[in-house]
């Protein structure tokens, strides 16, 4: 098991390292997104792949020697085994407790979003929740959440709406949910936290890029 954990950490480190070396500064944002998604799957599947090799075993003469093991040695061995603490079991308990806490935290965050109380409207065929309290605009799954101050004269600030609409359209929430689940079960992997930040940053760049393109198109049409 320890070998698999080390392989997972190594693979995710390599995938992330290659991203920083060759893709982080490139404008291939859509490619970057799928590279990170496939890289995540690769990092957590390859370590479980084993290649069996057949070894030719030559028959060698076996010399059998009967020897009686002193009773005192057997008793001492049994006593030592009984007194030895099972650290493996303790580590398993720690692992599942931390994973359980992270899963509970993720579910609580989702529940908190879903129970946000606000005015629901359909704006340009998108579900929008208008909240009285001040929040930074965000989207989750197929819904956009923003403060009422961005909704004036039956219109939402164009740039903000387009930005969040792109997150919804490109289903960025599923990427985030995936990385959160992976993080919950592999919290021991130091690279997974950098991986999450890289994915979210790439989502923001993707949305900004699409907003610029759409705003230019709208400006051309209006002129």
Model regions: which residues?
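A Zn2+-metalloprotease active-site environment signal
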Residues: 170-200
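Short helix/loop segments within enzyme catalytic domains
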Residues: 169-170, 194-223
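Membrane-water interface at transmembrane helix exits
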Residues: 19, 23, 104-112, 167, ...
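Active-site metal-coordination segments of metallo-dependent hydrolases
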Residues: 25-29, 129, 154-155, 192-206
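Divalent metal-coordination and catalytic microenvironments
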Residues: 36, 95, 142, 163, ...
């Amino acid at each position: 098991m320890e070998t698999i954990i080390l392989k997972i950490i190594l693979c995710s480190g390599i995938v992330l390292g290659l991203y920083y070396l060759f893709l982080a500064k490139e404008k291939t944002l859509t490619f970057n997104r799928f590279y990170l998604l496939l890289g995540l799957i690769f990092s957590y599947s390859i370590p479980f792949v084993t290649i069996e090799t057949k070894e030719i075993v030559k028959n060698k003469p076996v010399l059998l020697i009967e020897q009686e093991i002193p009773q005192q040695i057997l008793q001492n061995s049994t006593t030592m085994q009984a007194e030895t603490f099972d650290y493996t079991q303790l580590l398993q308990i720690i692992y599942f407790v931390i994973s359980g806490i992270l899963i509970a935290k993720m579910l609580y965050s989702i529940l908190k979003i879903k129970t946000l109380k606000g005015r629901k409207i359909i704006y340009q065929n998108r579900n929008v929740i208008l909240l009285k309290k001040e929040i930074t605009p965000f989207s989750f799954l197929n819904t956009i959440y923003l403060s009422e101050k961005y909704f004036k004269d039956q219109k939402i600030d164009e740039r903000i709406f387009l930005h969040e609409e792109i997150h919804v359209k490109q289903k960025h929430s599923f990427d985030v949910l995936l990385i959160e689940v992976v993080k919950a079960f592999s919290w021991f992997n130091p690279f997974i936290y950098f991986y999450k930040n890289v994915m979210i940053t790439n989502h923001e760049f993707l949305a900004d890029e699409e907003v610029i393109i759409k705003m230019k198109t709208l400006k051309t049409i209006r002129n």
